[in-house]
From Swiss-Prot:
<keyword id="KW-0456">Lyase</keyword>
<protein>
    <recommendedName>
        <fullName>o-succinylbenzoate synthase</fullName>
        <ecNumber>4.2.1.113</ecNumber>
    </recommendedName>
</protein>
<dbReference type="InterPro" id="IPR010196">
    <property type="entry name" value="OSB_synthase_MenC1"/>
</dbReference>
<feature type="binding site">
    <location>
        <position position="188"/>
    </location>
    <ligand>
        <name>Mg(2+)</name>
    </ligand>
</feature>
<comment type="pathway">
    <text>Quinol/quinone metabolism; menaquinone biosynthesis.</text>
</comment>
<feature type="binding site">
    <location>
        <position position="138"/>
    </location>
    <ligand>
        <name>Mg(2+)</name>
    </ligand>
</feature>
<dbReference type="Pfam" id="PF13378">
    <property type="entry name" value="MR_MLE_C"/>
</dbReference>
<feature type="active site" description="Proton acceptor">
    <location>
        <position position="212"/>
    </location>
</feature>
<feature type="binding site">
    <location>
        <position position="165"/>
    </location>
    <ligand>
        <name>Mg(2+)</name>
    </ligand>
</feature>
<keyword id="KW-0460">Magnesium</keyword>
<comment type="similarity">
    <text>Belongs to the mandelate racemase/muconate lactonizing enzyme family. MenC type 1 subfamily.</text>
</comment>
<keyword id="KW-0479">Metal-binding</keyword>
<comment type="function">
    <text>Converts 2-succinyl-6-hydroxy-2,4-cyclohexadiene-1-carboxylate (SHCHC) to 2-succinylbenzoate (OSB).</text>
</comment>
<comment type="pathway">
    <text>Quinol/quinone metabolism; 1,4-dihydroxy-2-naphthoate biosynthesis; 1,4-dihydroxy-2-naphthoate from chorismate: step 4/7.</text>
</comment>
<keyword id="KW-0474">Menaquinone biosynthesis</keyword>
<feature type="active site" description="Proton donor">
    <location>
        <position position="110"/>
    </location>
</feature>
<dbReference type="Pfam" id="PF18374">
    <property type="entry name" value="Enolase_like_N"/>
</dbReference>
Length: 327
């Protein structure tokens, strides 16, 4: 991860920090903070979640630099099918949430959230299944193997699942679960948070690889990993702003094959974004570069103390880019 022409003073000089209000609580937060960098090639987004320490967050900074200073890959397709995203909400809220994803034929439903029960997960999934033909669920590693096996039975009692995303935390658990159930398994955290992102595939622990641009270090880094994977790839958002979504669409548009809907419709989870949200047409988005609206940047600007927090974070992450590259 070599930043190339992006010096630290240059990055900080080009920095904008925004706080995006969310419609519903997601990943335990109601406001999403991200740092945006305007470079010679466009805008990049640094939005590593607040609890991530510099060694993990550095890849997210590399992704922002890649977008702001690098060149995008060639486009292979002009239409990216997307899935709707349904947080851990009561079933009554499901129709309103799905209405923000016009034409989407696939929905990803959050399950295994703290404080939730399997029964409430089943109710939520069935409410989604009544409105969308293809349903996948995401447990974010929240189950043990036995719990995941039980959940697979309960969640498929009234219809199939496209896949279980990260039902358990470790590669070993995923491999054991895959031997025990027939529902396909997708790996997310087991790829993006691993020292070796290919280990889960080599272990035969997943049927689908969920890849996210920012945690993997940028579009080109993601495409390099995807080229080494012999299972289908789904490109997904890391709760990105419109800038980060554009990077995800660029990656999805460059893949040689794209079999599944991508998780790149999460802009609908924000009350306000830095650019006008792209509206899906027949359940799909078109890849395009995005430039934030100056008025929105001003209106959504983070408080001075939060801006300084992100500056300090970039200063802590930046030296690690060279260290990861062996320089």
């Amino acid at each position: 991860m070599i930043p190339g022409p992006a010096t630290l003073p240059d990055l900080l000089d080009r920095l904008q920090v925004v706080a995006l209000p969310m419609r519903v609580r997601f990943r335990g937060i109601t406001t999403r903070e991200v740092a945006l960098i305007e470079g010679p090639s466009g805008w990049g987004e640094f939005g590593a979640f607040l609890e991530y320490q510099p060694p993990e967050a550095a890849a997210w900074l590399a992704s922002a630099i890649d977008a702001a200073y690098g060149q995008p890959p060639p486009v292979r397709r002009g239409r990216i099918p997307i899935n709707a995203t349904v947080p851990a909400v009561p079933p009554a809220q499901v129709p309103e949430l799905l209405a923000r994803f016009p034409g989407a034929r696939t929905a990803k439903v959050k399950v295994a959230e703290p404080g939730q029960t399997l029964a409430s997960d089943v109710e939520r999934v069935n409410a989604v299944r009544a409105l969308v033909p293809t349903v996948r669920v995401d447990a974010n590693g929240g189950w043990s193997v036995d719990q995941a096996a039980q959940a697979a039975v309960a969640l498929t009692a009234d219809g199939p699942l496209e896949y279980l995303e990260q039902p358990c935390a470790t590669v070993g658990e995923l491999a054991e679960l895959r031997r025990r159930i027939e529902v396909p398994i997708a790996a997310d955290e087991a790829i993006r948070k691993a020292e070796d992102p290919l280990a889960v595939v080599r272990a035969g622990a997943a049927d689908v690889a969920v890849l996210k641009v920012a945690p993997l270090g940028g579009v080109w880094a993601l495409l390099d990993i995807a080229a080494q994977i012999d299972i289908p790839v789904v490109i997904s958002s890391a709760l990105d702003s419109a800038v980060g979504i554009a990077a995800g669409l660029s990656a999805a548009a460059a893949l040689p094959q794209l079999q599944h809907a991508c998780g790149l419709g999460t802009g609908g989870l924000f009350v306000e974004d830095v650019a006008e949200p792209a509206i899906p047409v027949d359940g799909a988005l078109a890849p395009q570069r995005v430039a934030p609206d100056p008025a929105r940047l001003r209106a959504l600007g983070a408080a001075p103390d939060r801006r300084q927090w992100w500056i300090d974070r970039i200063k802590a992450c930046y030296p690690l880019l060279y260290r990861r590259s062996g320089d």
